[in-house]
């Protein structure tokens, strides 16, 4: 049980070791993820029937952003970090209860792994090690509203950049990691207020540091360490 009084039922393993580079929403980049249950919840009966669903909801904790107290307004990145709006009109991690909600693709349910049942997913917007407090099936007939208004976000995922990733550098990642990495870079991982074409950024992904610049709508990868 954590400080919020909720049981941590599992933790997710993702290619993202730090917050920089994590997609701003789930589904933007289809990076692989692996959900491992905590010991009290490693029961195959708890996931019986889950294999019939293509997507699931993850309810999780912003464990790297927990703080005492809260502010009724925040500065969302979509508005450049300058304009304040109500915290409940955003998906900011700085919330009264510090909980996140993500819909991810469920690739498979593995029942024969040493850690008990393991869920293999794609599209999570979470740092590796993030605690999960609940899992529920995604139901398209109840959970999808294609015509929903998007408020100040405009209802879209934002600009998509062109990615120039030299093949010899991309080859350092396995085939299951490459597409998610390209999508994460195309979504522009930089803070919205940073637009220095000469700056070299570093993004931790799958145990490597991807170094890149951004200029004229193109991400150019200059090194992988």
Report residues per predicted region.
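Active-site-adjacent substructure of cysteine-protease-like catalytic cores
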Residues: 48-100, 193-197
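Flexible glycine-rich active-site/ligand-binding loops centered on an Asp-His dyad
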Residues: 119-153
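Short, conserved beta-turn/loop elements at beta-strand boundaries and strand-helix junctions
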Residues: 17, 108-119, 217
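Basic/aromatic recognition patch in beta-strand/loop cores that engages polyanionic ligands
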Residues: 196-216
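Enriched for short, Lys/Arg-rich terminal
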Residues: 215-225
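Short coil-to-beta-strand transition motifs
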Residues: 2-8, 94-104, 206
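Arg/Lys-rich, positively charged N-terminal/basic patches that mediate binding to nucleic acids
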Residues: 3-44, 50-52, 140-184, 199
């Amino acid at each position: 049980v954590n400080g919020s009084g909720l049981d941590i039922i599992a933790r997710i393993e993702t290619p993202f070791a730090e917050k920089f580079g994590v997609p701003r929403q789930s589904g933007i980049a289809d990076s692989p993820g692996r959900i491992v249950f905590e010991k009290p919840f490693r029961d195959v009966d708890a996931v019986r029937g889950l294999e019939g669903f293509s997507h699931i909801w993850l309810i999780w904790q912003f464990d790297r952003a927990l703080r005492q107290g809260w502010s009724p307004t925040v500065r969302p990145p979509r508005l450049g970090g300058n304009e304040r709006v109500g915290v409940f009109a955003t998906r900011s991690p700085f919330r009264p209860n510090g909980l996140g909600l993500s819909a991810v693709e469920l690739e498979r349910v593995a029942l024969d792994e040493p850690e008990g049942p393991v869920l293999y997913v794609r599209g999570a917007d979470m740092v590796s090690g993030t605690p999960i407090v609940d899992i529920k099936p995604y139901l398209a007939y109840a959970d999808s509203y294609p015509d929903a208004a998007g408020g100040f976000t405009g209802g879209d995922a934002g600009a998509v950049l062109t990615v120039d990733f030299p093949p010899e550098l991309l080859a350092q990642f396995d085939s299951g990691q490459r597409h998610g990495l390209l999508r994460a870079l195309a979504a522009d991982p930089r803070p919205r207020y940073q637009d220095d074409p000469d700056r070299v950024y570093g993004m931790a992904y799958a145990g490597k540091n991807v170094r890149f610049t951004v200029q004229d709508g193109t991400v150019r990868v200059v090194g992988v360490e």
